[in-house]
């Protein structure tokens, strides 16, 4: 399991700890990942995803998992999220 968000692609970054004496040592900045269960209204199913806290706020802001995935860029999504997005688009096309 990689340390990256399945919805936004946010991952590990590297940088430096900088002391008061300006000594620099390498460090990693890890994303704040949470294992969450999100519900798809279109598919009527629950999906367990590993997302960052920022992505979780974005999902809430856009009005749920379906709306977030429809607006999201496919390049940022994980393979599981891309498959889920395609299923939602297909279901929406059938309903229309």
Swiss-Prot record:
UniProt entry tagged with the keyword ATP-binding: no
One of the GO BP terms on file: translation
One CC-aspect GO term: cytosolic large ribosomal subunit
Chain intervals with Polar residues compositional bias: 1-22
GO molecular function per UniProt: structural constituent of ribosome
A Pfam family of this chain: Ribosomal_L28
Record's keyword terms, sorted: Ribonucleoprotein, Ribosomal protein
Record carries keyword Ribosomal protein: yes
UniProt region (Disordered), positions on chain: 1-24
Similarity field: Belongs to the bacterial ribosomal protein bL28 family.
Record's protein name: Large ribosomal subunit protein bL28
């Amino acid at each position: 399991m990689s340390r990256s968000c399945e919805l936004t692609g946010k991952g590990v970054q590297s940088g430096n700890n900088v002391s008061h004496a300006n000594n620099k040592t390498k460090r990693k900045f890890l994303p704040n990942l949470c294992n969450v269960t999100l519900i798809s209204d279109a598919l009527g199913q629950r999906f367990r995803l590993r997302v960052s806290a920022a992505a979780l706020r974005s999902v809430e802001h856009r009005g749920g998992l379906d709306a977030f995935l429809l607006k999201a860029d496919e390049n940022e999504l994980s393979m599981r999220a891309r498959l889920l997005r395609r299923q939602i688009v297909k279901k929406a096309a059938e309903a229309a």
